[in-house]
C-alpha cells in the first residue's frame, strides 16, 4: 500500500515506473546509436524482415523488441494499478477496462499483426516522423486504406464520439453559465433542450455511457482495421468492394 503524497503507487505503480524508466533509457540509447539527436528524426526501427520472428542484435532491431516489451509491461502495470485504485474507491472497473482497449490496439499493431505476418519487421518504428512514414507507407501498400470497411467504422465512431460529447459539454457549459439575471439550469432543462433539438434525450448518465461505448468502439475498430490488412487481406482495399458492383439491384431491368 505504497503512496507518494496524495498519489497511490502500489506494487503495479512500481512495476510501471520500472518499465517506463527502462524503456526510456533504451530509447535514449537507441538515439545515441543513430545519426541524429533531432527530436523529429530520432527513430528506433524494428528488425529487418529477414529476421522473421527471431531475436535481432540490439543495434539492428533488438532495442525495438525490448522497448516493446517495456511498453507492454508499463501499459499493463498501469491498467492493473487502475484496478487497485477502483477497488479502493469501491467503484466499477470502467476506467481500466477502457484503457485496456487502447492497450489492445497497441498490442495488435506491435505484436499480434507482426506475429500473424511472420516478422517483427511489420511493426511500426518508434519515432515521430518515422512512425508517420510507416502509417503512410502501410496505407499505400493497400492502394487506398480509406476503403478498408473497418477503417470507415473506426473513423465514423471517432467523429461521432467527438460530436456526441461536444454536444453534451457545450450544453453543460450553457446550463451552468446563464446570462446575468437568469438562474442556473439543471438536468431537466438539458433533457428538454435535446428533446426539442433532436427529438430525444439520452439523459445525463446515458450520454456518458454512450460516449464510452463510442470511444471504445472506435479503438476496437481501429485495431481491427489494421489487423485485417496483411494477415487476412493482401490486395488493395478498393478491390474488396467488388461484391458491391455485383449486387442484383444493379442488374435489375438491365440486359
UniProtKB/Swiss-Prot annotation:
Residues that hold a ubiquinone according to the record: 194
GO terms for biological process, alphabetical: photosynthetic electron transport in photosystem II
Binding site for (7R,8Z)-bacteriochlorophyll b: 131, 151
Binding locations of Fe cation: 168, 208
Entry annotated with the keyword Iron: yes
PROSITE patterns: REACTION_CENTER
GO CC field: plasma membrane; plasma membrane light-harvesting complex
Membrane topology value: Multi-pass membrane protein
NCBIfam families in the cross-refs: pufL
Entry protein name: Reaction center protein L chain
Species annotation: Acidiphilium multivorum
Amino acid at each position: 500500500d505504497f503512496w507518494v503524497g496524495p498519489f497511490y503507487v502500489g506494487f503495479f505503480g512500481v512495476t510501471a515506473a520500472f518499465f517506463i524508466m527502462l524503456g526510456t533509457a533504451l530509447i535514449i540509447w537507441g538515439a545515441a546509436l543513430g545519426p541524429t539527436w533531432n527530436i523529429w528524426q530520432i527513430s528506433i526501427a524494428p528488425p529487418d524482415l529477414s529476421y522473421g520472428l527471431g531475436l535481432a542484435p540490439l543495434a539492428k532491431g533488438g532495442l525495438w523488441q525490448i522497448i516493446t516489451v517495456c511498453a507492454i509491461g508499463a501499459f499493463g502495470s498501469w491498467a492493473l494499478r487502475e484496478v487497485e485504485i477502483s477497488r479502493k474507491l469501491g467503484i466499477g472497473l470502467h476506467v481500466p477496462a477502457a484503457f485496456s482497449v487502447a492497450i489492445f490496439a497497441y498490442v495488435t499493431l506491435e505484436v499480434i499483426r507482426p506475429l500473424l505476418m511472420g516478422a517483427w519487421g511489420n511493426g511500426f518504428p518508434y519515432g515521430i516522423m518515422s512512425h508517420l512514414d510507416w502509417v503512410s507507407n502501410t496505407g499505400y501498400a493497400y492502394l487506398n486504406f480509406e476503403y478498408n470497411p473497418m477503417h470507415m467504422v473506426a473513423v465514423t465512431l471517432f467523429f461521432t464520439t467527438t460530436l456526441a460529447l461536444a454536444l453534451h459539454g457545450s450544453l453543460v457549459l450553457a446550463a451552468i453559465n446563464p446570462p446575468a439575471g437568469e438562474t442556473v439550469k439543471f438536468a431537466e432543462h438539458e433533457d428538454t433542450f435535446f428533446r426539442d433539438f433532436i427529438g430525444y434525450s439520452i439523459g445525463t448518465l446515458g450520454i456518458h455511457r454512450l460516449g464510452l461505448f463510442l470511444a471504445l468502439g472506435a479503438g476496437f475498430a481501429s485495431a481491427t482495421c489494421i489487423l485485417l490488412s496483411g494477415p487476412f487481406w493482401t490486395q488493395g482495399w478498393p478491390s474488396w468492394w467488388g461484391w458491391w458492383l455485383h449486387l442484383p439491384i444493379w442488374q435489375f431491368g438491365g440486359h
